[in-house]
Amino acid sequence: MVISPHSSVSPVASPSRPRIVAALSGGVDSSTVAALLQEQGYAVEGVTLWLMRGKGQCCTEGLVDAAAVCEQLGIPHHVVDSRELFQANIVDYLVAGYAEGITPLPCSQCNKLVKFGPLLAYAREKLGISQMATGHYARVRFNAELGRYQLLRAVDRQKDQSYFLYDLSQEHLAHSLFPLGEYTKAQTRQLAARYGLVTADKPESQDLCLIETYGSMRSFLDQYLGQRPGEIVDTQGRVLGSHEGIHHYTVGQRKGLGIASSRPLYVVRIDAAMNRVVVGEREEATQAEAWVSQVNWVSIPAPTGSLAVEVQVRYRTPPVPAMVIPESPERVKLQFAEPQFGVTPGQAAVWYHGDLLLGGGILERPSP
């Protein structure tokens, strides 16, 4: 990670004013966090990660807006050149995953390996600050009985982002604040307007930063993987059509298959070894159970026995009842109360007890 020479010099904070870093993307949420913490008496310093190579909203407008907010609040602004880190841990990770026929989840990976860990290290080593705050909609509490920091859903369930934070460590949570976890998005907008922030009316980003840069995930992947034609087959192996690359497909997909059929067909699995997309009827794209690896137990120690939970297998899907059956602390089997449609290898399965996020991991490819 290379530190930009444009970082400003930190002022000496009063002993009575705790120092904190605000991770600023240039959006209304992180901007409001900086203003809110300043109002609460913190000596705030803004840090923006320069992530993407080339042009894009997250690389140009975001940096400019973050700098404008810091100038408006009268706080230092530091820019950290994280482009190589982002390329290695996110871009290369995505490309490799799609080439193998899975659908990776970049946001949780980015939070752990690009944002929280490196940003906390930068704050400590370069600024002498041990606390950071972000604009994520989530909550953290300390459970004294367990001696453990716990991650909870945000008050605003429509904006809750705890799903993307499941892979954070106790060290990350111990030194992170999520001030917006107690607010709704509408209240955040109201706060931004009250503070008169230049980002108060900025539209909310709807896509991954990669999509904002490349226009679409398809364009992004085509730049790296190109076209790799192959067959679309049914579950019996009959050829129904052709595709231009398995990286254009994901399990559960129905639209854009480009094949004629008298009944609705969905992507059931992706066979990377044969360069094939396998399609079938909806029932064939459902699973009663799934294996999850790279598990991180966030709010509780890893259990030795089965656990009844509510699990999300995608960010926008509602939680459903399931049993978590540990094989080891790092690998578990999920048994769904009812078969689930479109359980996608590479995505995260994250399980909760009410608002409490217990743990999560990466969905494995099912056995053929």
Swiss-Prot record:
Enzyme group, top EC level? transferase
- Which cystines does this chain contain? C110-C209
Record's family?
Answer: Belongs to the MnmA/TRMU family.
Q: What is any one of the record's Gene Ontology cellular component terms? A: cytoplasm
* Known catalytic reactions: S-sulfanyl-L-cysteinyl-[protein] + uridine(34) in tRNA + AH2 + ATP = 2-thiouridine(34) in tRNA + L-cysteinyl-[protein] + A + AMP + diphosphate + H(+)
- The protein, known as: tRNA-specific 2-thiouridylase MnmA
Lineage, uppermost ranks:
Bacteria, Bacillati, Cyanobacteriota, Cyanophyceae, Synechococcales
Origin organism of this chain? Synechococcus sp. (strain JA-2-3B'a(2-13))
* This enzyme's EC code(s): 2.8.1.13
InterPro entries cross-referenced by the UniProt entry = MnmA-like, MnmA-like_C, MnmA-like_central, MnmA-like_central_sf, Rossmann-like_a/b/a_fold
Annotated function: Catalyzes the 2-thiolation of uridine at the wobble position (U34) of tRNA, leading to the formation of s(2)U34.
Biological processes per GO annotation: tRNA wobble position uridine thiolation
